[in-house]
């Protein structure tokens, strides 16, 4: 919980920092708190849809909890954003995850 507390403290002064929000969501996943991680990822992607890495992690979280249809949509949105940003590796990872769920 120490890392979570540190990240929360940093977010108090930098509430719009996408990196900190993403890092906090990952810490919640490590602690087994998928619900809190999901809220953070969803908020982050609403406010900063270009933060490409969060799509993959949110998609994997959704897969883990059995929300496959939403995971597919998240991967699709992430692939669009990755293409816009020219992030081919991120695009490929999300495409692979999407294909695994689709077929």
Sequence positions of predicted segments:
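Structural marker of alpha-solenoid helical repeat scaffolds
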Residues: 13, 47, 64, 81-85
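TPR/TPR-like (Sel1-like) alpha-helical repeat modules
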Residues: 68-87, 99
């Amino acid at each position: 919980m120490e890392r979570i507390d540190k990240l929360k403290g940093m977010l108090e002064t930098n509430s719009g920092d996408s990196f900190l929000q993403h890092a906090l969501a990952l810490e919640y996943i490590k602690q087994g708190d998928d619900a809190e991680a999901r809220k953070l990822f969803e908020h982050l992607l609403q406010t900063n849809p270009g933060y490409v890495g969060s799509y993959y992690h949110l998609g994997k979280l959704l897969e883990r909890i059995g929300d496959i249809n939403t995971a597919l949509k998240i991967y699709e949105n992430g692939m669009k954003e990755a293409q816009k940003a020219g992030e081919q590796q991120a695009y490929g990872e999300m495409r692979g995850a999407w294909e695994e769920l689709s077929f």
